[in-house]
Amino acid sequence: MQLSVKVSRFDPDTDSEPRLEPWTVEVEEGARVLNVLDAIHSLDPTLSYRSSCRAGQCGSCAVKVNGEPALACTEEAADGMVIEPLDLPVIKDLMTDLVSGISSIPRINTCDCGIIPKQEDIERIKPLRDCIECLSCVSVCPAMKVTDFLGPTSMRSQMRIALDPREPGNRVREAISQGLFTCTSCNRCWRVCPKNIETPGKAIEKLREIAN
């Protein structure tokens, strides 16, 4: 089938601002956004975008489709769609700088305590451990745009680690210093999460309960 789309193009070395470039390509029925990008790339190899697993498991292909974050490999392509980068610093075209966002996600501390998590510990952690670090939630977080809030995926990670009996640190105190109480509970991070992680209710509100 034939699809006409618009794709954001931006090269910081030559452009002062992004522009939407129109393309019409042939793709198979049921094609995903990533298939459209591949088709455009076959015609113009200078188009920059990321992809890896092509199965919705790595998060590397996250972009905005008609203004909303989505994984390019799982989002169905549609005629007239507009494909743009996430609201993160743009390296080129649809490629964004993920380093600062991913490097700020808290990691569990090394523990020589010999503690083995029980099944109930694992069950409590499960709703928070499916994150694929696509940073879609970071892209839409209004609090991050106006404060020093470290972001929803960082809070999700803090709560996940706080629930781990092997963790020796005070994760609630860390979360407070990272802007825990600046979250507005707008739920936008939950709505755009490709893994449907309920970060506001399962992480941020829980951390606030412990803090109080």
Predicted regions and their residues:
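Iron-sulfur-associated redox domains of electron-transfer enzymes in respiratory
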Residues: 1-96, 142, 147
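Ferredoxin-type iron-sulfur electron-transfer modules in oxidoreductases and energy-metabolism complexes
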Residues: 31-43, 87-88, 94-129, 133-212
